[in-house]
């Protein structure tokens, strides 16, 4: 199957995602909707951000336009009751959950002596705890999906567990938060292996040109040497449509997934056409 396959392979299946109002998460949701999936988004963005486009409502409109039914949930991934209610509403509305995408993430790359504990706690609560919370609450529905032969997956947007001290030394708080997400993948893949639930992580090999990156210092230059969110969306689609029992415990890079499935033209994902150097992403 190529990354551009247009079949509705996810027809009748349901995906629940943390975040997704914009950027990589929205691209993944739109790609899944185009393949027929029902989508639940859990996101805080009820109103527009002053610097970043997109709300959970505009995202829902894009998902519907792509062909998917959507349940937008305005809520905080840090709140247990909100996430539990979103899982319950999803099962009630769509009849189950087949795919969990842990996409919500906070970032602050300040060094340890400059990172306020409030920011540290925010990253741990959204990135690591939020991933654990949504995944664990969805397990009963995912087990039912497996028993029904519906090929359930958990996919977390987090990096390979690279123990080179370079990254921890540069941004310890953020590294702990992202590696916490990856450790959740490692543990749940083993815990749920016998259930036939695929649990994997996905990370971009290069930086991705999102509005959030553009608004950071030097962002315009960074975006120019980045790829578009669609490379992650196409890779995520290929992971969650693979056989769950045979695809678990992996830390995938987006371009590796695509080339393994026969993709040869990765230049179409460049923000800036040409053959100039691309900026590698963190943790690689």
Q: Across the structure, where does each feature detected by a protein language model lie?
A:
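Conserved Rossmann-fold SDR core element
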Residues: 32, 96-98, 182-185, 192-204, ...
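Substrate-binding pocket helix/loop in short-chain dehydrogenase/reductase
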Residues: 111-112, 116-121
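Catalytic loop of short-chain dehydrogenase/reductase
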Residues: 143-194, 203-207
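Conserved catalytic-site loops of classical short-chain dehydrogenases/reductases
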Residues: 14, 98-99, 121, 148-157, ...
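A short, exposed helix-loop element centered on a Lys and neighboring polar residues
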Residues: 135-136, 186
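C-terminal helical subdomain
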Residues: 201-202, 219-284
